[in-house]
Regions:
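C-terminal substrate/ligand-recognition segments
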Residues: 780-784, 788-794
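Non-catalytic nucleic-acid-binding interfaces of large nucleic-acid enzymes and RNP effectors
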Residues: 1-619, 628-777, 793, 797, ...
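Conserved short loop/turn motifs at secondary-structure junctions
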Residues: 622-624, 640, 806-812
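Short, contiguous acidic/charged loop-to-helix segments that flank catalytic cores in large enzymes
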Residues: 773-782, 810-811
């Protein structure tokens, strides 16, 4: 290794390099340095390649530097347009009145946005003035035509139309979709077909907008040339400073890029908020906490948080390796033309598109149905491509590192203290990704490790709601199947029918080895102990809620309590009541005065009872309750998870999908109030307390954020500030965030230069966001604290390998007994030794002004849950 290369790394000279080489071997250290240099170079080249493609396709306006420039230029040109419109209104009638009348139904901001973006995307060299003017005129006309079409629609029709528009990727298909809708509306006599401007009008309007752009912003110029035949030609070009700025800023952005990949030596231990992880020096260094660097320094630089550093460093210093046997199967399956859907590995070959019926030539309805089918086909194929791209990326990484004896995943934290890997291939991936890796440092199974190995296999198969003994017995009674899969997984595909097929396959290989070698077998497979609806577990513990605690398995029992099933049963009881005594269907009116059938609770209950309410119907809503989900959110989840899939199989399953979703959401909400009373009370208290802080002011007149320190010692600051920005949306040029319009008394000189800036948040806190975010952020910080303290305790007990995912605690099977006990002990200690809600109450009480402090309610009363019972609960974390 050339010592010159070390200048790019956080390696303190030759001595530290030599120490690393002595510790890990020169070949590994040099490989890590080369991999990091390659990651930086690859990321730079990928960004610049993307920029080149954007220039070629005329979409540079989507790139970062261009968007900043456009955002800054919009208010300048907007003011100039307002001035021009006033001059038109007070001047003599003429050509400019005609131009103004054509475009006046757009706001000045919309016109400015369309014109500026079109100019930038069409003027990266010297271009014909006529060409760029025509492009602007065409974009303006398309926008006006779009607005004409949507103006005829009510809210319901507009919602469906926008959904259809979003499904079309390219502008070509979007425009065709609008034109088709226009034709339908015209046939229904709801509007007149658009009277096309013609190129002359487009060019005239474009010319005027180019002129206003040049005069107001000073970002472009015209050049006059006279040809041999004395014809005068005008060309337009952006100012060279603008072109230089765009290229420089995009190049700078590219230089900040880095491909986060696994390391082949342990990551640099975190010792402060800015020093840890990769060895390379980056212009934009990776921080311990994912937030703006100034805030990170302010909040964490001087904070003593030994448990935080100890936990993160233990997790990221876990040695992993590629599971070669799973990788070999994955490489083979990836080449199959038809891959089982459960494997989360889309085929490389697209499905056959719908055939166009011969009748489509003469039958407009058949043609429309075929086009609709093609839209769905392209949608599904785009999803396939996207998923395939991710799979290929993970596989490529696995194949790159398959020969390395050890690999490592650098980690850092979000602002709540949750631990995240920086890499795509990681222990926190999906089933497929997790199965591709295993602990490099194996642990002998010993006397009881085989039980935890069987426990893992049963869970991956889908038996995680069965009693513990039944899970273990199932593995032994199905040994023949497991061994058959391990011998030839490409022939015996029964593993593909399980809940977590890839992880089950990894288990099959491991179980076969155990049966061959016995308790002395050195196992490398991570065994996961998962929380049971973790957020509700934490709220139930902090408020000693025995009802909620029992529902989420904090109390010992001989069977697993399935809160999703409990809620489903209560919902079914409510449905039966509505079936017997519910309301009837009636005709009602929309806000727009249109008649519609409002389904009664009796008929909706009938449909739901016929469909059946299982734990799958209630799972996501129950799980997300303590993460801030509301009845409206529940309805969206029910539509997505249950109703739409049901309708795809039986179009008559739900006659009014949205009404049925809202109805079910209300029932789930009602059922939850009786199951997790204290959790609901805790969330309500948190929202009130956070809202009071946001509405109050400190001595400097600024709003107060919500701040707390977790039991692990990690400071959390929830601070959602208001931003003086607004989003401008157009059909032709998409969306952009711009500063609020200039006030009437603002002074903008024509030709004033524009200096793009990074927008800063205002000191004012957004009360609504503070209240919405506090419950999920608070409970996430608590599960993060539990994870950190569990890791610290396990390190003290000798565990060196961790597979941690927020509320899932993974360790080698040979250390299963230790992890099983520790995760419960730490949970109990956390809430026995810390009254976290009361501490937060007292902290907020000290911050609030006298007029606000009287509005702060006491924390919800506590129940009678004996936390010590959690240590005896088999299913609290299983």
């Amino acid at each position: 290794m050339s010592y010159d290369k070390l200048n790019s790394f956080r390696i303190d000279g030759e001595n530290e390099y030599d120490e690393l080489c002595l510790k890990y071997g020169k070949a590994r250290v040099d490989r890590e340095i080369e991999l990091e240099l390659e990651s930086k170079e690859n990321a730079f080249n990928a960004f610049m390649s993307k920029r080149s493609k954007a220039i070629e396709s005329g979409t540079l306006g989507n790139m970062g530097a261009s968007r900043v420039l456009i955002s800054e230029a919009i208010p300048v040109m907007t003011k100039a347009l307002d001035k021009w419109f006033k001059e038109v209104d007070t001047g003599k009638p003429g050509k400019r009145h005609v131009m103004a009348s054509l475009i006046r139904s757009l706001t000045s901001e919309e016109i400015a946005f369309i014109a500026i973006r079109t100019i930038i995307e069409n003027s990266l060299g010297i271009v014909s003035l006529t060409k760029v003017s025509s492009a602007i005129g065409e974009a303006i006309e398309d926008e006006l035509r779009f607005k004409m079409v949507v103006a005829t629609m009510d809210k319901k029709e507009l919602s469906r139309f926008n959904a259809g528009l979003d499904k079309r990727i390219s502008m070509q298909f979007k425009k065709r979709y609008v034109e088709n809708k226009e034709k339908i509306l015209a046939d229904e006599k709801r509007l007149k077909r658009w009277n096309k401007w013609g190129n002359a009008n487009r060019v005239q309007i474009g010319l005027k907008l180019v002129d206003i752009f040049i005069v107001s912003t000073g970002l472009g110029a015209l050049e006059k040339t006279v040809g041999d035949n004395k014809n005068v030609h005008y060309t337009f070009c952006l100012d060279t400073d603008v072109l230089t700025y765009l290229e420089h800023e995009d190049t700078e952005t590219a230089s900040l890029m880095f491909q986060n990949r696994p390391m082949v030596i342990p990551p640099k231990p975190w010792s402060n908020p800015f020093d840890g992880g990769y060895l390379i020096n980056l212009k934009k260094p990776i921080q311990l906490v994912r937030m703006p660097s100034n805030e990170c320094a302010q909040l964490y630089d001087e904070v003593d948080m030994p448990n935080v550093y100890k936990a993160v460093n233990a997790i990221q210093s876990t040695a992993w390796r590629i599971n070669r046997r799973v990788l070999d199967v994955a490489n083979e399956v990836c080449s199959w033309a038809h891959i089982p859907e459960a494997l989360e590995m889309p085929s490389a070959t697209p499905a056959e598109p719908p055939m166009r019926p011969a009748e489509a030539d003469t039958n407009e309805e058949v043609q429309r149905d075929w086009r609709s089918a093609m839209v769905h086909y392209y949608q599904d194929d785009n999803k396939r491509k996207s998923k395939r791209y991710l799979v290929n990326g993970v596989l490529a990484l696995a194949n790159t590192y398959k020969d390395d004896m050890e690999i490592y995943f650098p980690h850092n934290l979000d602002f709540r203290g949750r631990v995240y890997p920086l890499t795509q291939l990681s222990p926190q991936g999906n089933d497929f990704t997790k199965a591709l890796i295993e602990f490099a440092e194996g642990v002998p199974l010993g006397e009881n490790g085989h039980t935890w190995l069987a426990f893992q296999g049963a869970n991956c198969y889908g038996l995680d709601k069965k009693p513990f003994e039944e899970r273990i017995a199932w593995v032994y009674s199905n040994t023949e199947m497991i061994l058959s899969i391990a011998r030839d997984p490409l022939q015996d595909l029964r593993w593909t029918e399980t809940d977590s097929p890839w992880e089950f396959l990894a288990f099959c290989f491991e179980w076969a080895d155990y049966l061959d070698k016995g308790n002395s077998y050195v196992s490398h497979l991570p065994i996961a102990f998962d929380g049971s609806c973790s957020g509700l577990q934490h709220f139930s513990a902090m408020l000693r809620d025995e009802v909620g605690g029992e529902a989420v398995n904090l109390m010992p029992d001989d069977h697993v309590h399935d809160i999703y099933g409990i809620v489903a049963s209560k919902v079914t009881e409510l449905l039966k009541k509505d079936y017997d005594n519910g309301t009837d269907d009636i005709m009602a009116k929309t806000e727009d005065g249109d008649d519609y059938l409002k389904k009664g609770t009796r008929s909706m209950a009938t449909e739901w009872l016929k469909h059946g309410v299982t734990r799958k119907v209630t799972k996501r809503s129950t799980m997300t309750l303590c993460y801030g989900s509301s009845k409206f959110g529940f309805a969206e989840q029910v539509l997505e998870d249950t109703i739409y899939p049901a309708l795809s199989k039986n179009p008559t399953a739900f006659s009014r999908p949205s009404q049925s979703a809202r109805y079910m959401a209300g029932l789930i909400w009602e059922a939850l109030q009786g199951v997790v009373v204290k959790a609901v009370e805790a969330m309500g208290w948190l929202q009130v307390a956070s809202g009071l802080l946001a509405q109050d002011k400190d001595i400097n007149g600024q709003s107060l954020p919500t701040y707390w320190v977790t039991p692990a010692g990690f400071p959390v600051k929830q601070n959602y500030n208001k931003v003086v920005l607004k989003q401008l949306r157009t059909f032709t040029t998409g969306t952009i965030r711009v500063k609020e319009p200039f006030k009437e008394d603002s002074q903008i000189e024509e030709g004033a230069s524009i200096n793009p800036v990074v927008y800063e948040r205002t000191p004012e806190i957004d009360t609504r966001k503070q209240k919405q975010g506090i419950a999920p952020n608070y409970v996430h910080s608590m599960d993060a604290s539990h994870l950190m303290l569990t890791v610290c305790s396990c390190v003290d007990k000798g565990i060196r390998s961790f597979a941690m995912i927020h509320d899932s605690y993974g360790a080698p099977a040979g250390h299963g007994d230790i992890m099983f006990t520790t995760v419960r002990e730490v949970f109990v200690d956390t809430y026995s030794k810390n009254d976290v809600l009361q501490d937060l109450h007292d902290h907020i009480e000290n911050l609030l002004s006298p007029k606000m402090v009287d509005k702060l309610p006491k924390i919800p009363s506590k129940g009678n849950l004996d936390l010590e019972l959690v240590k005896e609960s088999m299913y609290a974390f299983s």
